Amino acid sequence: MKYDNLLDRFIKYVKVNTRSDPDSETTPSTESQEAFALTILKPEMEAIGLQDVHYNPVNGYLIGTLPANNPTLTRKIGFIAHMDTADFNAENVNPQIIDNYQGGDITLGSSNYKLDPKAFPNLNNYIGQTLITTDGTTLLGADDKSGIAEIMTAIEFLTSQPQIEHCDIKVAFGPDEEIGVGADKFEVADFEVDFAYTMDGGPLGELQYETFSAAALEVTFLGRNVHPGTAKDQMINALELAIDFHEKLPAKERPEYTDGYQGFYHLTGLTGTVEEARASYIIRDFEEASFEARKVKVENIAQSMNAHLGTKRVLVELNDQYYNMKKVIEKDMTAIELAKEVMEELAIKPVIEPIRGGTDGSKISFMGIPTPNIFAGGENMHGRFEFVSLQTMERAIDVIIGLVCKA
């Protein structure tokens, strides 16, 4: 089905810079996210018929309700999307609209960049469709403003067609998903549903209830700096310690060598001097045992190095970030079975694969609300080559409507 306001709504959203800030200590991490919620989304939610629309300044969530119009549809279903965009330029987003894409290269604005099917073969899945791309200078923000636009448009459609019967619906738009803290302060009591869906997936058909389990690792290396001319048997180079530590991790267990259910260690930052160095890693795996084994391994490497050095010069700080939500959702697969049924009725093939990442649903599931993830359409997310198909977004709306009418 086509939805008249979808494209304009999406374009309006992506033009607002809501990039999150990993170094911020506030919630939301950037003022622009709160402004987006209060000045754009909240009035629009009220205008399309959502009730009890309210913003929580403590956790940055904007929530609204659409009560059921059929008392026999007793389930309560939630839909969640995040307002922030990833760590890439999001200022002056200038989307391009490619009608009836016929294949071949897409030049991104006046930049020297292009979407080339040889580099991005996923373009071949969208022949004949309307694509929204960047101009090559920013990301697009389909992750996750496509999800916001889809939820909004679905609600607008339902309130404009009161003869369509649906269950109770809760909507939540939250901050800071991209920096991993968006759901930390989520209040379950303010979102009373049986289960929910994040509209935060990628291509058509994605239905996901397995995520990584995730940990952040910070390793500090303490050296001893002396004049290099007299350094023999005295200098301890912290940078060399960092290199030694990194080389003790399995070389093939890095993101660029892994896929499917394989976990990894990912070095995300390395700074320092001879005197002191610091390495930042993320650790990811799907199975609980292998996730724990990865954390034990880095602890053991540090202990071994310290024993060899004769003193504690390698300091490890490990913090769990989120866990594989499969552990929660597989206890009651209702949300998955319902979504599969709706997709199949819409002639959409469910693509059930693990998310090599996390969603807000990872944390919210462990808070007591099973929250799998549904496709929102974005491709090549988090950079200048991001694009989305208007037709895939329309199909996501079809799924939302199907879910609440079948509940």
From Swiss-Prot:
Residues spanning the membrane: none
UniProt xrefs under SUPFAM superfamilies: Bacterial exopeptidase dimerisation domain, Zn-dependent exopeptidases
Compartments (UniProt record): Cytoplasm
Record flagged with keyword Zinc: yes
Cofactor: Zn(2+)
Function as written in the Swiss-Prot or TrEMBL entry: Cleaves the N-terminal amino acid of tripeptides.
This protein's name: Peptidase T
Species the sequence originates in: Streptococcus pyogenes serotype M3 (strain ATCC BAA-595 / MGAS315)
